[in-house]
Amino acid sequence: MNKKIFSMMAASIIGSAAMTPSAGTNTGEHLTPELFMTLSRVSEMALSPDGKTAVYAVSFPDVKTNKATRELFTVNLDGSGRKQITDTESNEYAPAWMADGKRIAFMSNEGGSMQLWVMNADGTERRQLSNIEGGITGFLFSPDEKQVLFTKDIKFGKRTKDIYPDLDKATGRIITDLMYKHWDEWVETIPHPFIANATDGMITTGKDIMEGEPYEAPMKPWSGIEDFSWSPDGQNIAYASRKKTGMAYSLSTNSDIYIYNLTSGRTHNISEGMMGYDTYPKFSPDGKSIAWISMERDGYESDLKRLFVADLATGKRTHVNPTFDYNVDMIQWAPDSKGIYFLACKEAETNLWEITLKTGKIRQITQGQHDYADFSVRNDVMLAKRHSFELPDDLYRVNPKNGAAQAVTAENKAILDRLTPIACEKRWMKTTDGGNMLTWVVLPPDFDKNKKYPAILYCQGGPQNTVSQFWSFRWNLRLMAEQGYIVIAPNRHGVPGFGQKWNEQISGDYGGQNMRDYLTAVDEMKKEPYVDGDRIGAVGASYGGFSVYWLAGHHDKRFAAFIAHAGIFNLEMQYATTEEMWFANWDIGGPFWEKDNVVAQRTYATSPHKYVQNWDTPILMIHGELDFRILASQAMAAFDAAQLRGVPSEMLIYPDENHWVLQPQNALLFHRTFFGWLDRWLKK
């Protein structure tokens, strides 16, 4: 298989070059969309109990077959001994070490549905552990490994055939409440947690610890098994859930942390009265405390992520980082229970941090122009996953005391070494309200300041997502620069990582300061002699797509081309057709029919569809019909308006993609269409 050949190539070079995954001989190539689609993708990882070996998953996209295969690998933490331990036509997920360090548990769809499997650490003696009807979506063994918690989807609500059994071939859905759709699916199932004995042979069923409750755990669409935690004694399970349905669910972000006792079968809420989004519970190793991530306000999904710790004996809850103005993510207790490690993004760089609970002292462990995306700690050994604008995900060994990082893997070294390096600059720009805005400027390969280049303004989605050092297989800033463009990527008002005041400014101000920030970034870069001011485009997805539609009606000839992916064209239509109403209420300010709602009416007044009369610049719309967050009719309306206005326009519509573009051939079609459009209008 191709992946096997690639694995052998990678294994031959990692041992000697693990410290510098981008080092090697540059052959002067540039990254094309076709070459980009051959890059492998590192995903889940786990550190062995002795801290010496990592197991991790890698997916290999195949454009020809239009699918990706996922395999598992092990590697020593010095970068040596990399080995592919699975090689099947199925896909393997979520590898986890068993306590003896000799076996690895994982999920595989080898039998058709996703089930729990186990094998030796060298890949031998592969054995299926579960045969759960419909498959599982996640698993977590108890500390003594005698029990396993698994999650699976259960039926939710009544379907048409339940109401009319004689109409078993009818396809219509009878809807009676909100949240009938979510993200990219009709809500006919919800995930529930089950526990089962793991020592009695094949697992075919389990006890639903939320039996009879019509609520999600984990919470869709983002949460997974990380929202569960076993107590060290194996007697309790902590989990996060938003125990609401229908309209109440659509209006509220209020979730809570629950602890289920296996002996009594009782559940109690340890975050009762905390009205925001509570998630990611983790018992301390000594079993005395539990930590979790908490937002303060109901209905605000981008509120500050705070770190809370509760004393399990007294129930006392403590906000342990009250002066920390950055989001806390992916917490893990220190082995001695005296501190907690976490990820936090500060000024568009995501690094590893540690808080000492007794003193409240917070220490930044790692530094640098990159994003850490995951980590695991065993004793004094830390394994982390990291990427940047320039390099995709790889694994690194991090010294938790001084932050020194050594590369463990170099999955795409054979390809990356052939490419001409690119440069990424960090610039601070003064905004029109007197603020300071960090803007990334990504330069093309072989950049020559004496030449003129076309440029692209990258508009971020979210809207409250930092333009950090991300690596995306859709919106990839390196890929844009590799096509000969200067990429301008501002952290405009309304993104985290620069204090909560900066982050919150965008709420109720969609067409306001953040749009002026985009224009500021473009105007500042146009002062550079190497930027061709007549050949600048603006691109973006989701809120970035909204930004593009808005800029199309307000840019005063700054731009020569636009691309909007999954963007909002009509804010009133968006309010009436989206599913998570808490988001629309907080960000927009409320429904459009509240004529005396000043904030809402101000927001609706900035809706891009109200300024189509100003459209005069070529624009490409891209959208997926399975996008239930922002319906594809938004792109259709924008395209029709552009066509009727006589504005050069195209639309790429996917019947089988959601808010993202996930299938390999569709992804390559996205890139070819994207760059074809930009080249057509910006490289004349």
Swiss-Prot record:
Residues 1-24 form the signal peptide. The active site is at S542 (charge relay system), D627 (charge relay system), H659 (charge relay system). It is found in: Periplasm. The gene is dpp5. Optimum pH is 6.7, using Lys-Ala-MCA as substrate. It comes from the Bacteria. It is an enzyme of class 3 (hydrolase). This is Dipeptidyl-peptidase 5. Pfam families: PD40, Peptidase_S9. Its EC number is 3.4.14.-. Homodimer. The keyword Repeat applies. WD repeats lie at residues 87-127, 220-259, 323-363. Belongs to the peptidase S9C family. Keywords: Aminopeptidase, Hydrolase, Periplasm, Protease, Repeat, Serine protease, Signal, WD repeat. Catalyzes the removal of dipeptides from the N-terminus of oligopeptides. Prefers Ala and hydrophobic residues except Pro at the P1 position, and has no preference for P2 residues. Shows high dipeptidyl peptidase activity toward the synthetic substrates Lys-Ala-, Gly-Phe-, Met-Leu-, and Ser-Tyr-methylcoumaryl-7-amide (MCA), and slowly hydrolyzes Val-Tyr-MCA. Is likely involved in amino acid metabolism and bacterial growth of asaccharolytic P.gingivalis, that utilizes amino acids from extracellular proteinaceous nutrients as energy and carbon sources. The lineage of its organism: Bacteria, Pseudomonadati, Bacteroidota, Bacteroidia, Bacteroidales. It comes from Porphyromonas gingivalis (strain ATCC 33277 / DSM 20709 / CIP 103683 / JCM 12257 / NCTC 11834 / 2561). GO terms for cellular component: periplasmic space. One of its GO terms (biological process) is proteolysis.
